[in-house]
């Protein structure tokens, strides 16, 4: 069953472009990279929002560290985020596994001319 994605930017894709692009996008956890858009996980649902690749100005990875836990705070975990900049906005999306985020960033480098990494 196809559920159309919600456009997060001012630019929108027509339904005849959006549907096949979303159906055949490459999946990275709750995210997807198609030929025309980057699909983002929203509200616990996979690929429910999208940003056209023409609207994205920059993407990069942000890493964080959890508050210490187990044995008086001596063990820490890393948190990884995909940060997307578009239309003058910037939003971070959480990834569970860093290797999936690295694979998505590598695919963006290869398939598009969007700058990857901080300026």
Regions found by a protein language model. Name each.
Residues 1-35:
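Anionic N-terminal interaction surfaces
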Residues 2-3, 58-119:
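Acidic, Ser/Thr- and proline-rich intrinsically disordered linker/docking segments
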Residues 16-17, 21, 39, 87, ...:
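A near-ubiquitous, low-amplitude feature marking generic local secondary-structure context
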Residues 17-18, 55, 118:
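A generic alpha-helix propensity feature with a strong bias for hydrophobic helices
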Residues 28, 46, 77-79:
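Short, surface-exposed coil-to-beta transition loops
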Residues 30-31, 49-50, 82:
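His/acidic/aromatic-lined binding-pocket segments of jelly-roll/cupin-type domains
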Residues 34-72:
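Phosphoinositide-binding peripheral membrane targeting modules
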